[in-house]
Amino acid sequence: EAEQKRQIMEVLKTGDVIGIVSPSHVAVKNDYDIFRKGLENLGLRVKYADNLFHRDELGFTASLEDRVSDFNSIIHDPEVRMVLFGGGLGAVDIVPYIDYDGIKADPKYFLSYSDGTSILNAIYANTGIPAFYGQSPGEFGNVSEYDKMQFVSNFLEGNVHEFKKNSEWTTINAGKCTGRLIGGYSVNFALTLGSRFYPYSMDDDYILLIEECDMFQSVRSFSTYLNAISQNKIMDKV
């Protein structure tokens, strides 16, 4: 079923619309206008969600209502072919309110990383439609040649099953395996794995991807999250 849904999503074409939302942080318009220009330079159009630049009374993110409204409005927008969002904190807040039936009715590309992986995993687990770990809006402000190449190759040329190595990556134990890729930011995945919005079938095999940044977590904290993940029954299928 997931592969059938994948086939429905055509590669992006010149003039296609990227919808930008911000479920995890306060978006600053001056910055996002720069990110927007980077996407437009690739021949794409950009649509900001209505409440993208709002913030709540604490100044941390837009309100939950605004973030849910933005995300579901972008889902229902037939013109939008990719939904792009960044990281921060708070993406998991909107997971119970996402219109998963709306996503299944009109499959789009969902692209994010870090805190946004809470949403990527929920979309895949509840719809069977692949979501994509990759660039956030900020990468397009001064996009590197590698990020540009990967984005164009994956989404404008359709080479989503090909990965070209970045020289900064290091392989510790080489090998080959097959399975469905799950995972994401370590603390998010550890805290949400097994909840009702993250149901994983024990009939599938999985490849586990874990993201961490030493700016935000200590080795001790990362070890705690990794051990919590390793004690989940899903690891029998990894």
Predicted regions and their residues:
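ATP/NTP phosphate-donor binding region
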Residues: Q4-E79
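Conserved beta-alpha junction segments in alpha/beta enzyme cores
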Residues: V26-D31, F35-G38, C177-M215
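N-terminal glycine-rich "phosphate-gripper" loop used for MgATP/nucleotide binding
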Residues: M82-V92, Y113
